[in-house]
């Protein structure tokens, strides 16, 4: 059956090819499309029913017609050759080198569709990952094996932040085998050059694998890239015992491609035109993060997405939030004031933070200090709102101090630029900023930590 060439292409719709009178095909099966001039394309079976197979074509459909195409079903799924030689390399969305280096040849070939980790085999994430970003490390801590997305908006600094995290991320244990898989989905050529230059100039390319998909590439490429990136990370994590950080940007472009293909299949649309199965599809990507009991490696995910119209209720951030373990939210207001990284800590959350901080991981005062910073910043923003109504001179003396704290917090703690801060520097800076407030306002920190880490003189 696998040697049969089908000449029964009945329809071509967008990136989809419809083949009739087909027998014994399977979901995700790879297909060869052979044109009469000898040119060959590849595709993947999306659906098969009653002898009809719907094939999603990799790459462009230009030149393909119902009369000049023969289809051969290979009987196998998309398998990626993987090797530790991929470290330091740059590939396109299909895992093909674009850095003028040699192709990857390996006896190890893995199905890119992978599978989610069996819940019984999961090991609880518990190790701190230092990103060098105070608003993340200090207040929304990333834990090894966690999936923590960044919610951004058009024109915000998520690309700059992604590149900074990629070059700075590490664990605190010396000698750790740490690596980065960076997948860029639907980006411009300018953005692609920016990422390449950032990785090369910082020296972080040597322990990274980069996959780039351009906006000019076909939509199918965007569907494949995150799965190829995660397959590479899984090999390095579970076969080579590396702790891998996977950064995927922009997942909104992935979901737009999913919507485009769903429309071409004439499926009934869900919310805002996205397919009803988008939650399930996203979970097959996000749930590949984690640690496996008995294995030394791990996969930590930072998917980045731009919220259309800055709308956090859009299906892309909404469904992502249901699957992942928190979110880092970027603020357009802070961006307008030239604060970078423009992280809105009050809208951000790391649900696994408590498992990666404290005396065994960072420092004993970490939890209480983070809570105090949150509470004090919230009061400072309330004081700012009140001052805009009644004037700053009408505020109480304590409210004026909270207002000053909020300004200092944004300008010194949040706004750190390209400077990398250790967790020790981040925690110490937090105590420095709190010293502008009366010591009796420190309701969230343990009293024993105030004289040990605080910056007050004479207890005031």
Swiss-Prot record:
Membrane topology: Peripheral membrane protein
InterPro entries: ATP-synt_VA_C (IPR055190), ATPase_F1/V1/A1_a/bsu_N (IPR004100), ATPase_F1/V1/A1_a/bsu_nucl-bd (IPR000194), P-loop_NTPase (IPR027417), V-ATPase_su_B/beta (IPR022879)
Keywords: ATP synthesis, Cell membrane, Hydrogen ion transport, Ion transport, Membrane, Transport
Lineage top rank: taxon: Archaea
Pfam families: ATP-synt_ab, ATP-synt_ab_N, ATP-synt_VA_C
This protein's record includes keyword Ion transport: yes
Alphabetical list of CDD domains matching this protein: ATP-synt_V_A-type_beta_C, ATP-synt_V_A-type_beta_N, V_A-ATPase_B
One cellular component (GO) term of this entry: plasma membrane
Stretch forming the signal peptide: none
Family: Belongs to the ATPase alpha/beta chains family.
Described function: Component of the A-type ATP synthase that produces ATP from ADP in the presence of a proton gradient across the membrane. The B chain is a regulatory subunit.
Family matches, as HAMAP family: ATP_synth_B_arch
Record-given protein name: A-type ATP synthase subunit B
Organism: Picrophilus torridus (strain ATCC 700027 / DSM 9790 / JCM 10055 / NBRC 100828 / KAW 2/3)
